[in-house]
Amino acid sequence: MVSTHIGGPAETVTVFVALSVGAIFIDLFMHRHDKPISLKSAALWSVFWVVVAMAFAGFLYVHHGAEVASLFVTGYALEKVLSVDNLFVMMAIFSWFSVPDRYRHRGLYWGIIGAIVFRGIFVAIGTGLLSLGPYVELIFAVVVAWTAVMMLKGGGDDDEIEDYSQHLAYRLVKRFFPIWPKLSGHAFLLTQKEVDAELAKPENKDVSVGRLKKAALYATPLMLCVAVVELSDVMFAFDSVPAIIAVSREPLIVYSAMMFAILGLRTLYFVLEALKQYLSQLEKAVIVLLFFIAFKLGLNATDHIWHHGYSLSATTSLYVVLGVLALGILASVIFPEKPEAENKES
């Protein structure tokens, strides 16, 4: 782990905020209408977010040097790769709630806003905990390694469909709001007046919600879906934040790397959804990277305890992350996933 200290210089923070907020407004303006996002559009927007991140990396290179820029790019690439598995979970959630493609971008937006907030909290806590000593790094190493082991053991469970009605987030929303059973545009909540208007429609004559027992607000399936996505991402952050902190203890580097990676996830989601069957080996790449990060954390912790002198530079970490990602993509091309019908026949 590299502990390059840059603090929180006003100029760097200003550029970070201006780039990220400006790009968010551009994205929101261009996607203000509820319509499906094509693969071409998603790919172009994914490139846009990578360019924004690399622009910030260029700023760091000019103002703070190659080492800091390398740490940022390593953290950014690592968060992108680790997020792939999380995006596949999001696909399963949207599918289970039967959310149409035209509403998924809006649902992802609110899910990612929550991710940005919680990542900030976890980064502050994580970097603060590491200041307590090397034994905290060992704990982080065990957490990351355990995640890799569980992913390895659960590799064959991809076809199992989870019942998200038993999810904690689902049950929490249901405790505070009655549930309107149908989507109502991109609305997350409906007022009693809106529910009455829905109940007046012939196709809703069999719906009993809101007829006898009235309420101020009703949660829609889109609200339930976003709540499940949000809590699932929080659980994912428990694994990803220690992994990114393994790259650097500098909060600004860690958070900015995660922030720019997360902001591009909405459009990356649609790219992965279209190319999912062609990226079948990426999960294995994620597992390899988690073991690498656990090793890096453990190596750094034992160096602090026993002073053996071994460590991995930021450049080496960057090469490993990019190399494993490239191998994962190459393996997916060489060993593509068999279609379901072919799997059943064999």
Swiss-Prot record:
Q: Where is the signal peptide?
A: none
Domain of life according to the entry: Bacteria
Q: In which compartments does the protein localize? A: Cell membrane
Q: Where do the TM regions start and end? A: 6-26, 42-62, 81-101, 110-130, 132-152, 227-247, 252-272, 286-306, 316-336
Q: Which keywords annotate this record? A: Cell membrane, Membrane, Plasmid, Tellurium resistance, Transmembrane, Transmembrane helix
User: Which terms in the GO cellular component ontology are assigned?
Assistant: plasma membrane
One GO term (biological process): response to tellurium ion
Which membrane topology describes this protein? Answer: Multi-pass membrane protein
> What functional role does this protein have?
Could conceivably alter the intracellular level of tellurium in a manner leading to resistance. Alternatively its presence in the membrane may provide a barrier to entry of the tellurium ions.
Family note: Belongs to the TerC family.
State the NCBIfam families in the record. R_switched_Alx
UniProt protein name:
Tellurium resistance protein TerC
Organism the protein comes from: Alcaligenes sp
For this protein's source organism, the top of the classification is: Bacteria, Pseudomonadati, Pseudomonadota, Betaproteobacteria, Burkholderiales
